[in-house]
Amino acid sequence: MILHIFNPEHDIALSYDNKYFTPPHAGRQLRYDLDYLPALWAKDGDCIIVGNTTSAMVHARRFMAHVQRVRFISQDEVANVADEIELVSPWGWDSAIKFQLMKLGIHEDVLPSDAELSEIRTLSNRRFSAHVLQQLQQDMQLPFLCGEAFYVESIPALKDVIQSFGKAIIKAPWSSSGRGVRYIDQAMDAAITSWAARVISQQGGIMVEPYYNKIKDFGMEFFVDVAGVHYAGLSVFHTINGAYVGNSLSTEDEKRQMLAPYVDNRVLDRLTEHLTQLLNDHLKGKYQGPLGVDMMVVANQNTAADTPSGFFVHPVVEINLRRTMGHVALSLSKEERFQQRMMRVDYDGAHYHLHTIHKEQRF
């Protein structure tokens, strides 16, 4: 039996790297409100840790017909099923979630070792994404692939790179969606300089990359097992100011059609092939579980460059070494009644809600 738990505060926990980490209120609320999500991909007989089993059942029934095949359990019930657990599947692995699970009575032999968690944290640093981006561009040698990112360890070095870019984006090496990111227009002001200095002090450095005129967000989802990395499907998603808003729920062919005006299907095939191999080279034997690679279509800002569609593709904006909302969308898209709809996460001022809406409705 697999035990599932939704810990969306994972990205922030990685930045703190402290088993006693307490997430901010928003993270705790998101975890409580959407803790039923693993029911969408859990197998028959699996258990899911939730805050309120009755509420979880009600919410899960909105999205799946056979929710009774999985079992929602409270934290108090975990110790009762500990001997049945063969595998634990969180949203993402970090030292805090391991500590929480051990306190609930999960046997240590079904949890990753501290060394494995350290490796996962290292690979979750945005430096790894930048390294894979560089390798992918070198391997594919396509003129319409773009993207560069640099890791710097001081404010003077950061200012030098920003000066060469003009408009730039700086990112904390470990941070969650929409957080830990600042946009720079020509030069850093005092507030951003102070923020960047804190990031460098706490995390050892900071990422800096040029600002791109983004046209469309998309990504690729993968799963890693003992055999290696396997492609799971495309993700066409939507963000506002860098924060996730929602996903298109469609078949793989339909998502390819959405991207066709910007990215030729043959390019997608080559990207998938090369990226799968690169990820396999880096991750096999070091990580098992889901992951996602965020990408984007970029406007052609270089009129001298000839691109088949008139657009560029940034193939590795970041690598999320965890489950993503793209994986959630893939699970929902298997239900025919949700296809041609949009998956959306809303906050009403008190609670988070997962909805599916008609594509005609705006985010």
Where is each model-derived feature located?
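N-terminal-proximal low-complexity accessory segments that begin disordered
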Residues: M1-D44
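Conserved N-proximal alpha/beta basic substrate-recognition cap immediately N-terminal to
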Residues: R28-L37, I49-A157
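ATP-grasp fold ATP-binding core
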Residues: L133, I162-Y183, G204-K214, V293, ...
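Phosphate-binding site of ATP-dependent enzymes
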Residues: G166, I192-V245, M296-N300, D306-V316
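A long amphipathic alpha-helix within ATP-dependent nucleotide-binding catalytic cores
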Residues: Y231, Y244-F311, A350-R362
